[in-house]
Curated annotation (Swiss-Prot):
EC number: 3.6.4.13
Species: Shewanella baltica (strain OS185)
InterPro entries: DEAD/DEAH_box_helicase_dom, DEAD_box_RNA_helicase, Helicase_ATP-bd, Helicase_C-like, P-loop_NTPase, RNA-helicase_DEAD-box_CS, RNA_helicase_ATP-dep_RhlB, RNA_helicase_DEAD_Q_motif
Residues annotated as domain Helicase C-terminal: 243-390
Renumbered residue ranges of the record's region Disordered: 395-438
Location relative to the cell: Cytoplasm
Top-rank taxon, per record: Bacteria
Protein's UniProt name: ATP-dependent RNA helicase RhlB
GO molecular function, one term: ATP binding
SUPFAM superfamilies listed in its UniProt record: P-loop containing nucleoside triphosphate hydrolases
Length: 438
């Protein structure tokens, strides 16, 4: 994490439980991010908060530290049953729930608190076995949590801490009725520590907070600009016929260490995957139709570096916590201005530098004025020579073909026949076909 992203507040100087401090120190957490520095002193006084913070600001660790500290510092409710968690963390997506659980496990090492996770797309029985053994902190999506509550598999009578993450996204996805259903089955708001985080504290989000929380303190880390200064943006105006060749050419020029390519439709994403796979890249596909187990595997491969490129619809634009994404390519300009911000926000995180490259083709160019108005600046335009684009591109792969476990191709574009060579780990010589780097 870049030092520019951190505050001067040390975790060691906060009145945290010794086991929480030990877990933080062992995992390299020394200084707080701004949202952590503002929210933790409030939460450690057992006061509720409604926090405004973007993804990548450290809010996950803020509410996890507060949750663990609260449970370790508060007596277990009298008469608590094994099927009653003490804390519940609600997330809008499976991917976000999984990432939160991974971070929670880091803190759980020395605390003896059990962490459980539930979400749709996985076997009920497998998740139920974990719940039957008892969990202290339950993390999950609202739909699956409600299923288990209605079946009597879990009870909410012993809840002492509640986290609602990405509350604005919960509204977007229509989950607010589910959230209110769960809140009504918990102890009264003044008997638990309540935490809400949202990218925006709109009136509807604030209404939710005041309905189900105990006079929450508003904590805001609002960026001065909607897009990070760490992200270099550029936009091209390709024809629909040249978009794919331009993308493949730019990827060769940039040779990104880790990139996400966004498109607006599942069909377009599948087409992109086919061309990138056919061109020898290590690429994964993430859309709403991908089975959950495969989604998890793809994200793990992308995170670990087994895949270099992830092609995704906006299902992946929020809730993904993947470090070191160097490039984001908007193959299609999104219809929703906020989606543009969320997409490019996958890079340039935690003080790191990032690149955002967008295409304004005939179909989606009309979205650009609204996007630029929303982000309060014009996106610099880059030009290219059509004749300089790659021409000898391999045949696209079949979408149903099993992904090879081999390595990403490292091609010598200077040869007429474009012979392939396997990636050795070293960056290839840059081919500046579009003259962007001249």
């Amino acid at each position: 994490m870049s030092e520019t992203h951190l505050s001067t507040q040390r975790f060691a100087d906060l009145p945290l439980h010794p086991e929480v401090k030990q877990a933080l120190a062992e995992n390299g957490f020394e200084f707080c991010t701004p949202i952590q520095a503002l929210s933790l002193p409030v939460l450690l006084q057992s006061k509720d908060i409604a926090g405004q913070a973007q993804t990548g600001t450290g809010k996950t660790m803020a509410f996890l530290v507060a949750t663990f500290n609260h449970l370790l510092s508060t007596p277990v409710p009298e008469g608590r049953l094994i099927n009653q968690p003490r804390a519940i963390i609600m997330a809008p997506t499976r991917e976000l729930a999984i990432q939160i659980a991974k971070d929670a496990i880091l803190l759980a090492k020395h605390t003896h608190l059990k962490v459980g996770i539930v979400y749709g797309g996985e076997s009920y029985d497998v998740q139920r076995k974990v719940l039957d053994q008892g969990v202290d902190i339950l993390i999950g999506t609202t739909g699956r949590i409600i299923d288990y509550v209605r079946q009597g598999i879990i009870g909410l009578n012993s809840i002492q801490a509640v986290v609602l993450d990405e509350a604005d996204r919960m509204f977007d996805l229509g989950f607010i009725k589910d959230i209110r259903f769960l809140f009504r089955r918990m102890p009264e708001a003044n008997q638990r520590l309540n935490m809400l985080f949202s990218a925006t504290l709109s009136m509807k989000v604030q209404e939710l907070a005041y309905d189900h929380m105990n006079e929450p303190v508003k904590v805001e880390i609002a960026p001065e600009e909607k897009t990070s200064k760490n992200i270099k943006e550029e936009i091209f105006y390709p024809s629909q016929e040249e978009k794919m060749r331009l993308l493949l050419t730019l990827i060769e020029e940039d040779w990104p260490e880790k990139a996400i390519v966004f498109s607006n439709t599942k069909h377009s994403c599948e087409t992109l995957w086919s061309w990138l796979e056919g061109d020898g890249h290590r690429v994964g596909l993430l859309t709403g139709d991908v089975p959950q187990k495969k989604r998890i595997r793809i994200l793990e491969q992308f995170t670990s570096g087994q895949l270099d490129i992830l092609v995704a619809t906006d299902v992946a634009a929020r809730g993904l916590h993947i470090s070191d994404v160097s490039h984001v390519y908007n193959y299609d300009l999104p219809d929703d201005c906020e989606d543009y911000v969320h997409r490019i926000g996958r890079t340039g995180r935690a003080g790191n530098k990032g690149m955002s490259i967008s295409f304004a083709c005939e179909e989606y160019a009309l979205n650009l004025p609204a996007i630029e108005s929303y982000i309060n600046h014009s996106i610099p335009v880059s030009n290219y020579d059509s004749e300089a684009l790659l021409a000898d591109i391999p045949t696209p792969a079949k979408i149903h073909r099993k992904h090879p476990s081999g390595t990403r191709n490292l091609r010598d574009r200077s040869g007429a026949s474009r012979p392939g060579a396997q990636r050795s780990g070293a960056r290839p010589p840059r081919h500046d076909r579009t003259r962007r780097h001249s």
